[in-house]
Amino acid sequence: MAWLRLQPLTSAFLHFGLVTFVLFLNGLRAEAGDLRDVPSAGQNNESCSGSSDCKEGVILPIWYPENPSLGDKIARVIVYFVALIYMFLGVSIIADRFMASIEVITSQEREVTIKKPNGETSTTTIRVWNETVSNLTLMALGSSAPEILLSLIEVCGHGFIAGDLGPSTIVGSAAFNMFIIIGICVYVIPDGETRKIKHLRVFFVTAAWSVFAYIWLYMILAVFSPGVVQVWEGLLTLFFFPVCVLLAWVADKRLLFYKYMHKRYRTDKHRGIIIETEGEHPKGIEMDGKMMNSHFLDGNLIPLEGKEVDESRREMIRILKDLKQKHPEKDLDQLVEMANYYALSHQQKSRAFYRIQATRMMTGAGNILKKHAAEQAKKTASMSEVHTDEPEDFASKVFFDPCSYQCLENCGAVLLTVVRKGGDISKTMYVDYKTEDGSANAGADYEFTEGTVVLKPGETQKEFSVGIIDDDIFEEDEHFFVRLSNVRVEEEQLEEGMTPAILNSLPLPRAVLASPCVATVTILDDDHAGIFTFECDTIHVSESIGVMEVKVLRTSGARGTVIVPFRTVEGTAKGGGEDFEDTYGELEFKNDETVKTIRVKIVDEEEYERQENFFIALGEPKWMERGISALLLSPEVTDRKLTMEEEEAKRIAEMGKPVLGEHPKLEVIIEESYEFKSTVDKLIKKTNLALVVGTHSWRDQFMEAITVSAAGDEEEDESGEERLPSCFDYVMHFLTVFWKVLFACVPPTEYCHGWACFVVSILIIGMLTAIIGDLASHFGCTIGLKDSVTAVVFVAFGTSVPDTFASKAAALQDVYADASIGNVTGSNAVNVFLGIGLAWSVAAIYWAMQGQEFHVSAGTLAFSVTLFTIFAFVCLSVLLYRRRPHLGGELGGPRGCKLATTWLFVSLWLLYVLFATLEAYCYIKGF
């Protein structure tokens, strides 16, 4: 691993070794030019040797004098080289802002309605941007913006004449990405572990296009119109970009012929190459009121987007459960923060995130995730410490507490409580009350009452009574109302020296009636044994309730002792401790007792969505009366003839017998915990990486720019705690603080959904890229290097270093290999179609309007393209072979296989650079 951590440094030494070797050969050729064959007519000495005559740059002028002494030349080389490195750092930092804006843009969401298999619908949010489309468009543009813009600026800045720097940088960068980056990713995986590409169809499409892109370059340079790029060739090259994106999207969505490929396929077992399909076949989803992609598999309708949402929820629930088991002493807020950091660390991340993370860790800006976790912890702590004082309220609120009362018919009177809350309790307050008929009538069931409640200074509540009239008639429970009105406060008396004007300027104590200002009194008949019932026929409970309590009411009488049996009955929810604990027993209602409670334990399964039911059933009530009523209702008395007096007494006894009421069976529906569900939803929103990498204000950006933070590694710990910055962090921070402060002026990503930052960043990248192109050209001509060699050796390396670190982090942290190597092929294709296609289209159109042709030298570029294409076939073949069962995936595997693959890829890159350099200096015959 130590070699790996020094990989960029090692690669740099290899570069300098190659440069030294080339310069040495160039010197030998200059001294012994007579030993070589005379160049052909189409190949003069100037084209074979690096020109020492520097040309005017797009932005930078020529450094005069043009023929300096050896000492001045060395000084110029050092200045140009240091300036190149510093400009590469600047481009990396502004590209950090650029990629952050892309992450915010591609993270935009919209609401969709998803149909579940049971026909129900639910509303959720999905990303507007398809992952494959964003990777091939904005993500590829973000990671390859310097190469693409360099090609365009070089052509436009030099009078629409083709140059070697831009195209050679694109090809050289493609070689570095394909061989060095993939080689590093293969090696960094721990021994015995593997990573394989998940979206294999998309990888095949982008890999095919990346190889085709360079074959196409050779065709237009050496076959269709050698040395000339026609308008149609440039436009067609540019047009291949949307075609590539479209086909990759089709493969990702399984459209066209892909929709018939429902099953998993594998090749002949003797060959051993396993090709897997990812995910399930997309089903119906209703989006914006219309059904889209409604394909069916096995008769089930399960939307792909819905499945992805469910998977993310299940993963979040699993994380919360695991953390709760590991840290039972933590409260919910602490668990949420830990789960947030864990989910952010382990979720699949975009290419943009890894690029941003790599740049910030290189420049002393710290680990994004740990900084985010620390900020969230500080925010939570500060919120818990801040207590907002409620504004003083001069108005006293007067109301009933409670607002519902129950009493037996023989109670004599019922007491009602009036409460005042808030305001100045040192004042005397008055409030009137009056009874109103409901189903109970004044004079027959209760005594009409009205009056005034006086709350003296310091009193916050007061009681008053209403008389209840008793009778011996069986009747239903009845109710009446008591209403409050005309609340007022005793007026302030004028003190000595106080005028009415001064008194009016003071905040007067006020009083208002608050809800509930009407109380309901229910009179329970005491002449009947009672009707026993639940309050309703259905009740919804949260699975996190623990023990649910259900009331059984005794209405229309409460005379005597009654036993009511009860038991739980299974529905879709199962008893025996699986979903609830089986419960059964008897409730004993004593004389005048009107309410009993049944308790049932609910098992908390911590599910995001849950809806299961069971029932609680009441049995026939048993009257424990031992008087004449029980005797007349006994079977022995029923068999003999009764007298008229006994018949009347039996009829009255039958009327007073306890019975079941309207709701003898209660359905209990167990639902998900609303608190748990909201916690999961909140966590899913908080794990949006756009919130982590994005910025909300210029203040945040400037504070971040001047703050040095520790880099660290995700794999070091899972706590999310920040470490102290190292010496390297401080050095890199002070080296790059100028760029950080300068680029803090870029609009925050929150503005215009990231588009403002996107536009400003790409303009700055274009300007810096133009300067890099001039510096690289002047550096090359100062030491006698051709632009094509400078591009392959220096510029391609400088623009690819952040991608190297990003891919290494992605390979280690992601479960799949898509983010680390899957984007390499797509990025290589996009570089050609956008970088070269756009530049050559503009130049070809310009010269066509002038009535001339756009000339491009086919020699060096065609040779480099051909060489890269051959080596790319070898690289892709090896990656495909590594999917064999005994290796398991493109990355990692047994140590011996890892080393062999890595050395093969590094060797391919070294050979590419060597052959391209030798061809550029005519040691190898090109095309």
Curated annotation (Swiss-Prot):
Q: Which residues bind Ca(2+) 2?
A: 409, 470-471, 526-527
One Pfam family, short name please? Calx-beta
* Alpha- repeat extents: 140-180, 796-832
Q: Give GO BP annotations, semicolon-separated.
A: calcium ion export across plasma membrane; calcium ion import across plasma membrane; calcium ion transmembrane transport; calcium ion transport into cytosol; cell communication; cellular response to cAMP; cellular response to hypoxia; hematopoietic progenitor cell differentiation
The residues on the Extracellular side of the membrane are: 31-73, 169, 224-230, 748-754, 800-828, 882-903
Keywords attached to this Swiss-Prot or TrEMBL record, sorted alphabetically, are: Antiport, Calcium, Calcium transport, Calmodulin-binding, Cell junction, Cell membrane, Cell projection, Cytoplasm, Endoplasmic reticulum, Glycoprotein, Ion transport, Membrane, Metal-binding, Mitochondrion, Mitochondrion outer membrane, Repeat, Signal, Sodium, Sodium transport, Synapse, Transmembrane, Transmembrane helix, Transport
Locate the residues binding Ca(2+) 1: 409, 445, 471, 475
Q: Is Glycoprotein found in the keyword set?
A: yes
Q: Which residues form the Calx-beta domain?
A: 386-485, 519-619
- Region named Putative calmodulin-binding region: 253-272
**GO function terms (MF aspect):** calcium:monoatomic cation antiporter activity; calcium:monoatomic cation antiporter activity involved in regulation of postsynaptic cytosolic calcium ion concentration; calcium:sodium antiporter activity; calmodulin binding; metal ion binding
Residues annotated to bind Ca(2+) 4 = 445, 471, 475, 478
Record InterPro entries: CaCA, CalX-like_sf, Calx_beta, Na_Ca_Ex, Na_Ca_Ex_C-exten, NaCa_Exmemb, NCX_ion-bd_dom_sf
Annotated Ca(2+) 3 binding lies at: 409, 471, 473, 475, 525, 527
The similarity annotation says: Belongs to the Ca(2+):cation antiporter (CaCA) (TC 2.A.19) family. SLC8 subfamily.
Name the record gives this protein? Sodium/calcium exchanger 3
Q: Which organism is it from?
A: Rattus norvegicus (Rat)
Q: Which taxonomic lineage does the organism of this UniProt entry have? A: Eukaryota, Metazoa, Chordata, Craniata, Vertebrata
The primary gene name is Slc8a3
